[in-house]
A protein has these predicted regions:
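Basic, alpha-helical interaction scaffolds
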Residues: 72-141
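Catalytic palm subdomain of template-directed nucleic-acid polymerases
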Residues: 12-37, 55
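Hydrophobic packing residues in well-ordered alpha-helices of helical domains and bundles
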Residues: 25, 29, 43, 96, ...
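Active-site palm subdomain of RNA-directed nucleic acid polymerases
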Residues: 1-16
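Acidic, serine/threonine- and proline-rich low-complexity regulatory regions
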Residues: 111-124, 141-149, 173-184
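Short linear motifs embedded in intrinsically disordered, charge-biased segments
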Residues: 147-258
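Conserved pre-motif C helix in the palm subdomain of viral-like polymerases
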Residues: 1-4, 128, 240
Length: 258
């Protein structure tokens, strides 16, 4: 796994270490190392990390992985992949915190534009291009698993921006949304996720993510277009594929009704 990692080392709660001889991941790393050497390439060892996804509270088996027999790979709690912070507990508060911080760090653009006499339209375009775009980065990955607190914190970014843009004319967030013909960030993220799901559903390469429901048994309930993804845990139920499946199923059912 490559990316920008959190430097903190994961605590060994139980002291269990996976024997390298029984570690299939080590076999894959060895194959990758041999492939790189054969093709005269080099693995960036500083950016290669290990992340353990384990929800057990009693056993914490850490894989002891090495490259070139002399470099042990660091085990991390979180890592940044393509701009998104992924945690080993599959929660998104670190990623949400990063997004909000970036958005507020650009709020000075609006204040400076206002200071130098920019009109509402110019400030609004700046907000859309420079701030809102950041708040939506890779949202199909994490939107389904946001907590209510995270949803509110993200929405506050747009509330603040519209208040700055409207200035003395600002009365309420609802009025500002109506004035600019905007949807809330929550509604917009859901729309973006649905758009992504529809594109994936229509793409032959990714359509297998959303298998069609071929059940022919007649019931009183409306037949779902896609096979629902079953989950034993709420954590998995809020992960990308089950979340996008439910969004797309709901969308297709609405189309059938019309």
């Amino acid at each position: 796994m490559h990316g920008i990692a959190n430097p903190c080392q994961r605590p060994v709660r139980t002291g269990h270490i996976l024997d390298p001889d029984n570690n299939l991941i080590q076999d894959e790393i060895t194959k990758l190392t041999n492939y790189a050497q054969h093709h005269k390439m080099k693995i960036n060892q500083a950016k290669t990390k290990v992340m353990l996804f384990n929800q057990s509270r009693t056993i914490d088996v850490l894989p002891a992985l090495v490259i070139n027999e002399d470099t042990h790979l660091e085990t991390v709690d979180e890592i940044k992949l393509l701009g998104v912070i992924v945690r080993n507990d599959m929660k998104w508060h670190s990623n949400t915190k990063q997004i909000i911080s970036k958005c507020y760090s650009r709020m000075w653009m609006l204040r400076n534009l206002k200071k130098y006499g920019a009109n509402e339209e110019q400030m609004f375009e700046t907000y859309i291009q420079q701030i809102r775009s950041i708040s939506e980065l890779s949202c199909p990955v994490w939107n389904g698993a946001l907590t209510q607190i995270e949803v509110i914190s993200l929405e506050r970014v747009q509330k603040t921006a519209l208040a700055v843009i409207r200035g003395a004319n600002h009365t309420s967030y609802a009025d500002a949304l109506e004035h600019f013909k905007l949807s809330s960030l929550k509604e917009r993220r859901e729309a973006l996720c649905l758009k992504f799901a529809i594109k994936a559903y229509k793409n032959p390469k990714f359509s297998k993510w959303f298998p069609k429901n071929v059940n022919t048994i007649n019931t009183r309930r409306q037949q779902r277009a896609l096979v629902p993804i079953r989950s034993r845990t709420l954590r998995y139920g809020k992960s990308p594929l089950p979340y996008l499946n439910e969004l797309l199923n709901t969308h297709l059912m609405k189309i059938d009704k019309t």
